Every structure is written in structure tokens, then in C-alpha cells.
Amino acid sequence: MASPSSFTYCCPPSSSPIWSEPLYSLRPEHARERLQDDSVETVTSIEQAKVEEKIQEVFSSYKFNHLVPRLVLQREKHFHYLKRGLRQLTDAYECLDASRPWLCYWILHSLELLDEPIPQMVATDVCQFLELCQSPEGGFGGGPGQYPHLAPTYAAVNALCIIGTEEAYDVINREKLLQYLYSLKQPDGSFLMHDGGEVDVRSAYCAASVASLTNIITPDLFEGTAEWIARCQNWEGGIGGVPGMEAHGGYTFCGLAALVILKKERSLNLKSLLQWVTSRQMRFEGGFQGRCNKLVDGCYSFWQAGLLPLLHRALHAQGDPALSMSRWMFHQQALQEYILMCCQCPTGGLLDKPGKSRDFYHTCYCLSGLSIAQHFGSGAMLHDVVLGVPENALQPTHPVYNIGPDKVIQATMHFLQKPVPGFEEHEDEASAEPATD
């Protein structure tokens, strides 16, 4: 095992000027955005008012302490929090014993966004650990010796692609992984999360993500999957876990991202979906809620905001003339303010909302959402909107896979050099059969 000192904090340069525009949340009229319950209190409205009060305290502290121009991403503190997490966890994480590949992914992706390199010895240790989590049946379990499950399989493949070395790629048993995906496929096009487990949109996304990254998609593996996902879109415009259920940010992201991978985005009512997701950004807090009438949560900075690049791409492909060519269809500045002011733990790590504890899950998805809010487009269309000091800028993340775009390209190029397991061999056998009259 590598010692923690094998990590070296890389402090970015600090020569650029600070952001000088006024903050959205500190406008004199911003209080008008608070909840108006028309004197009819409900459990929901009471909880919303409590959250708004805590967030107002945070906004006020910035205003009265003259810290307005000093919105700073506490990079070094987050880096040290993440570095420790790869080596040692407190007993509070005992409940995540079946999610250990997720911890690897959340931490590695957070470091990737912060542009912190992974030392070779640490990368090797992660590869060896994830190899222990791989099941002989295919796929990865939540820990060594545990049953395989699509969620930790997704996390493990993403973590290995972030490392991006031959050693990491070689951990993945593609033949067994394909067999495992087939074993979970259902006649209606959906996938089980694990043998004997539940079906929902997450499993379709996890399957599509790992299959596309590792080049194991066969002609019939996702037959009927796009149609099943489309049936999960409900009257609200968002996507539920299964057909007929309430729209939810996490399920909606999984559904649309899976359809992007399968090139079937048009299976959805995209305008209805756009209306639903843009309505989930909270007017007062600036962050996103996961469902209608729920509270703001930092993790939806990615699950909801990450939908907007996917929708932008899909609507652009349809020739929508109303699309901006310089910004996403949500308030990017307001989201950055919420994350930077309300979601940073003073000792490192990020959190759901003021008053909550930090964890690696929220650290990963708050940083991922911050990256989405900072970067529009790519190449000639790139337009950055970085709030606060210039050093707040994060590395971009791929809106479909939520790992670095360069890591997606590197992994797909690597695995495209390998045949789809069992597929080319089957084609060769078919072509070798003698012709019959």
C-alpha cells in the first residue's frame, strides 16, 4: 500500500483577476424568491422554509463580512479529504461496505475534476482492489467476495477508466461482463440490477454505460431497451424508475444518458423533459431539487444540471433555432453560488445543504455539477463561466459517463481495438458455413 505522502497537492496558478460581477443571490430583491405559502402551512412548506432560513444565513454572512468577491473553491482542503478517503475511512462508512467500488469512483473522479494526478502506486492498489471485487460470473460486487451488481459494476468500470492504464483496462473481464449483462436482460428490454433484484432505469443506464465504454455491445443486447425507457417518461416530463412512477432527477439522468448512448434520444418528448428539469432549479437557493416539492440537494447539481448538455445536444440535432450557443438552459451562475457558498465543508469535502455532513458522494456530484455549470460546449464552441477566483475552474466532465472526456475517448479507443466478445467469432463461424442450394 502506498503511503498518503505519495500524493502531492498541485496548487493551480493564481495570476488571473477575480470575478467582478454581482452575485445573483445577494441582489436586494432576492428575498422575493423565497417560498410564499399563502398562509397555508404543510409539512413540505415548513421544511422548505427552514432550509431557506439556513441558506439566507449563509448568503448574509457573505454580504456582511465583505467576502462577496472571494468565492473560493477550497481545493487544498478537498484534496486532503479525498486523499485520506482512499486509504482510511471512519466507522461512519460501515454502512457502505457493499458500495466500495463507488467510494473508489467518487474519490477518483473528484480528484480528476480537481486536476490532481493519481500516483502510480495508488492506481495499482485501486486496480488490485477492484479486481478482488470482480465476480467469476462477470461484473463487480460491492466488495471482495460479494455478489455482482450493476451499480458497483458501473462504478468500478468508471474508476478503472479514470486510471486509464493498461493495468486498469486489463482488470475488466469483458467476456464475463457481457455474459453477466445478458443474464440480467429482461424480455421487455429492461435490466435487473442483480440476479433476483429489482428493475429500474438505473440498471439500463449502468448496462449501457459499461457496455459502450468496453465495446461489448451486440446487436441484440439492448433490443427493446430504448422503448422501455421511453415508457418511463410520465406526464410531468421527467422519467420515473419504472413506467408509471413519479419523475425523479436521478432516474431522469439515467434514462436520457442511456438513450444518448443508444442513439435513441428522440424516443422521449424532449421539450416536456426540458420544461421539467429547468423547473427543478430552486429560485432562492440556486441549486436543484430531485423531485417536485422536495428540498434542494447538492447532488442534483449533477443529476439535474447534467441533463442540460444532453438535452442541448439532442435539440441541436433536431435543428432547434432557439438554442443558445454560449450557455446551457439553466442559471449557471446561481448553481455555482449555491455550491461554493452553501455546500463546502470548512474542513474539506462537500455536502447536501447547510447543516448536513460531508461525504464522498456529495463531494463527487457537487464538483461534477460545478464543472457542468462552468463549461459550455467544447472546441470552437467552448465558453467558460467560472464564478469567483479563476482557480475555481475545474476540469470538464463528460455529461454521459461523468468521467473526464479524455478518459472516455482513451477507453473507447483502447477497447475498440478488441473484438466484441463472442460476436466476431460467431460471424466468422457463420461465414464459414457451406452454402446450400
From Swiss-Prot:
Cofactor annotation: Zn(2+)
Co-factor note (free text): Binds 1 zinc ion per subunit.
EC number: 2.5.1.58
Catalytic activity: L-cysteinyl-[protein] + (2E,6E)-farnesyl diphosphate = S-(2E,6E)-farnesyl-L-cysteinyl-[protein] + diphosphate
GO annotation (BP), single: protein farnesylation
In-chain residues carrying the UniProt-annotated modification Phosphothreonine: T436
Positions annotated to bind (2E,6E)-farnesyl diphosphate: H248, G249, G250, Y251, R291, C292, N293, K294, Y300, S301, F302, W303
UniProt entry keywords in alphabetical sequence: Lipid metabolism, Metal-binding, Phosphoprotein, Prenyltransferase, Repeat, Transferase, Zinc
Job of this protein: Essential subunit of the farnesyltransferase complex. Catalyzes the transfer of a farnesyl moiety from farnesyl diphosphate to a cysteine at the fourth position from the C-terminus of several proteins having the C-terminal sequence Cys-aliphatic-aliphatic-X.
Protein name: Protein farnesyltransferase subunit beta
Organism of derivation: Bos taurus
Gene (UniProt): FNTB
